């Protein structure tokens, strides 16, 4: 946000992982226009408004889509209310980067329908291109992939039904890719450096926290009105579906009714397939269906949390709930009501006797009562009111469950990161003199305490640089994961750096990689964790701050260097004393005396622009603690020089004896060409949308 306020594109994030791509982290949505709201209202309020706006867009978009597909005003309204009340949607509101793509799904399907069915003109093509671009820019790549997948199935149904529109769809797709080109290229560029470039393994994808657990499947899908922690009840935070028993039953009625209708089958079949596939894929890599998708669908293997497919399952189900409300009179048929009752009894038996549980007898009893209520409604209500009453039951059940939804459980009196603890406040002051920080503080607890304890990435709130960080995507680079072996023989590469540290911490290696400050929670004994560190520099009732005596500096001149060797990080861990004065880069520097590296003055003007002042009495390798990747350009005294990769991760340049001003600037070569293409495509799309038709 600070970069945007200065009219700069934040290509890099200087505060985590020793500087990593920021624009290339698709989930951040740097180029997503609604993010500008945060510039006007501040980060906390601004992102709250963004979430509210997207919830409105999701609900109203669902109403519009339902009406376009032939639902009644009642069915459309119920679908719109249900889609914002279900647990999978409510949970995503605390992750703005995930609710944003989901909010576009109904509008994207609506725009696809308009583009294919338009009789003439190109206005609908331009509208679809703009909506598709909004989707591509909107946030988390896994959710974008899910939305695009649903849209692809829906498009197949459209083509089969209307047998036209391929050219129009192709033009819209081309324009949307062109408009999103700067972001797409940044994402691909970042992915090429990421440790997950080859995709995630089945072992990673089988993590119980990231899949729908069979035993708790009913709990995750039906939810409960008994209160308690939704994440614990569902098996995991990401597994919260909470569609409600009434919602699932009425949605099932809607699926059957839509599939039976020849006029609705073209769209109901793809969306029913979305629900089936989404549920199967949410179970993780335990079925052939998942394996096939893992092998064949581009990007499918990059999604860490399989259970996130429940989000699009919920959106599709909400639409079918609207259909079910419209088709509620079918329950007046004894044959249909008996079939439904039999299905409910079968599910109850599976939950009661099988591997799937209800969590508690009370929850199971409430599920049965709710199902019975759905069956009773057609008997006691007037035929013309059956749909309204069923819709009311669904909405009330979801509304009651939403009282204990995740957003209502993590509310705080003040904005996250609004205040720092006394120790962290002092650290913010002394850290202005340089050095990065690592925090050995709790990984669980109240959200405001996690932020004050500098949980990885939270240090950004306080303008504190760190070699540590947390991300499930492209910001975990290959050089960074390889560097972890300098601190541990068996590092946890999917977790923050601090998870690979044991007592006592490797002070010399941390100092070499720029770590000057250590924050300890008071449950850790300093004599055990940082026995050779100076301090405490600051302390309070929760934390203490310590200074590393082996810190080399943010920028350093090395006088001894040799080419990199295999297993470099292991050498730095096990044989550090023999290489403490030697840097590893594609350069040979011999030194016989006074070989210890020298700290240099450096200024970070922006994340993408650094200036280093060096005065050396012999040839040296000047290094700064910033990750080296494509896009960096270096000059020495105004003349371009080659940038070198040092110690497998940082950027450096070779200089001769003398005084030097070294400048490092980052901007990828593809940026301006991509911007020109994007602006041109936007102009074309806008002309399509707003041009006036000339009639004779």
Task: Describe each model-derived feature in a short phrase.
Residues 1-11, 173, 178-258, 280, ...:
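Periplasmic/ER-lumenal interhelical loops and adjacent helix-loop junctions
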Residues 1-59, 81-106, 204-237, 243, ...:
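Membrane-interface coil-to-helix junctions
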Residues 8, 280, 349, 579-696:
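Active-site-proximal, structured, solvent-exposed surfaces of multi-pass membrane proteins
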Residues 46, 50-53, 244-257, 261-286, ...:
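C-terminal substrate/ligand-recognition segments
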Residues 49-63, 245-252, 269, 670-693:
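Selective detector of the "anchor" transmembrane alpha-helix that sits immediately C-terminal
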Residues 56-69, 73-160, 168-187, 193-194, ...:
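Membrane-embedded helix bundles of polyisoprenyl
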Residues 96-103, 115-118, 123-133, 143, ...:
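Contiguous transmembrane helix-bundle modules in multi-pass membrane proteins
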Residues 199-205, 210, 359-367, 383-386, ...:
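Extracytoplasmic
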């Amino acid at each position: 946000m600070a970069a945007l306020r200065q009219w700069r594109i934040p290509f890099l994030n200087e505060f985590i992982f020793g500087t990593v791509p920021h624009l290339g982290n698709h989930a951040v949505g740097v180029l997503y226009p609604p993010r500008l709201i945060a510039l006007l209202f501040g980060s906390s309020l601004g992102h709250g408004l963004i979430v509210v706006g997207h919830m409105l867009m999701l609900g109203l978009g669902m109403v519009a889509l339902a009406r376009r597909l032939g639902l009644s005003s009642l069915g459309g309204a119920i679908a719109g209310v249900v889609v914002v009340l279900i647990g999978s949607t409510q949970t995503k509101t605390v992750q703005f980067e995930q609710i944003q793509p989901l909010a576009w799904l109904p509008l994207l399907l609506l725009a696809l329908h308009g583009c294919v069915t338009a009789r003439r003109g190109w206005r609908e093509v331009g509208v679809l291109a703009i909506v598709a671009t909004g989707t591509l820019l909107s946030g988390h790549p896994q959710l974008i992939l899910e939305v695009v997948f649903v849209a692809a199935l829906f498009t197949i149904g459209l083509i089969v039904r209307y047998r036209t529109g391929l050219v129009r769809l192709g033009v819209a797709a081309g324009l949307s890719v062109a408009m999103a080109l700067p972001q797409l290229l940044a994402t691909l560029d970042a992915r090429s450096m990421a440790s997950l470039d080859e995709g995630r393994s089945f072992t990673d994808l089988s993590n119980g926290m990231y899949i729908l657990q069979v035993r708790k499947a009913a709990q995750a899908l039906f939810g409960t009105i008994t209160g308690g922690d939704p994440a614990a009840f569902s098996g995991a935070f990401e597994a919260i579906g909470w569609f409600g028993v009434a919602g699932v039953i009425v949605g099932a009625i809607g699926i059957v009714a839509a599939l039976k209708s020849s006029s609705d089958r073209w769209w109901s079949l793809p969306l029913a397939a979305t629900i089936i596939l989404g549920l199967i894929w949410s179970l993780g890599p335990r079925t052939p269906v998942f394996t096939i998708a893992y092998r064949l669908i581009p990007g499918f293997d990059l999604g860490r949390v399989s259970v996130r497919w429940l989000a699009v399952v919920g959106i599709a189900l909400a639409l079918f709930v609207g259909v079910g409300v419209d088709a509620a009179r079918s329950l007046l048929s004894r044959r249909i009501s008996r079939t439904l009752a039999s299905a409910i009894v079968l599910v109850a038996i599976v939950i009661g006797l099988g591997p799937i549980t209800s969590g508690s007898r009370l929850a199971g009893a409430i599920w049965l009562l709710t199902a019975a209520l759905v069956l009773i409604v057609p008997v006691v209500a007037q035929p013309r009111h059956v749909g309204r009453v069923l819709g009311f039951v669904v909405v009330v059940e979801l509304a009651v469950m939403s009282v204990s939804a995740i957003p209502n459980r993590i509310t705080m009196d003040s904005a996250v990161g609004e205040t720092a603890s006394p120790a962290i406040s002092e650290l913010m002051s002394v850290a202005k003199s340089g050095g990065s920080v690592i925090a050995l503080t709790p990984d669980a607890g109240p959200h405001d305490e996690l932020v004050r304890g500098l949980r990885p990435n939270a240090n950004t709130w306080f303008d504190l640089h760190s070699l540590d960080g947390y991300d499930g995507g492209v910001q975990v680079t290959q050089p960074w994961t390889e560097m972890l072996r300098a601190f541990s023989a068996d590092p946890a590469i999917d977790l923050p750096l601090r998870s690979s540290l044991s007592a006592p911490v490797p002070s010399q290696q941390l100092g070499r990689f720029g770590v000057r400050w250590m924050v300890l929670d008071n449950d850790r004994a300093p004599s055990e964790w940082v026995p050779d560190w100076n301090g405490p520099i600051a302390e309070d009732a929760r934390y203490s701050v310590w200074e590393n005596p082996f810190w080399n500096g943010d920028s350093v001149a090395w006088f001894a260097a040799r080419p990199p060797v295999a297993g470099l990080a292991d050498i730095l861990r096990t044989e550090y004393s023999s290489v403490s004065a030697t840097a590893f880069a594609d350069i040979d520097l011999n030194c016989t005396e006074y070989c210890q590296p020298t700290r240099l003055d450096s200024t970070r003007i922006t994340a993408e622009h650094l200036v280093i002042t060096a005065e050396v009495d012999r040839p040296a390798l000047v290094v700064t603690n910033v990750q080296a990747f494509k896009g960096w350009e270096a000059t020495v005294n105004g003349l371009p020089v080659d940038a070198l990769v040092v110690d497998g991760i940082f950027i450096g340049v070779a200089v001769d004896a003398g005084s030097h001003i070294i400048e490092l600037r980052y901007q990828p070569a593809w940026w301006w060409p991509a911007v020109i293409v994007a602006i041109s495509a936007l102009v074309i799309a806008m002309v399509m949308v707003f041009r006036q038709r000339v009639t004779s």
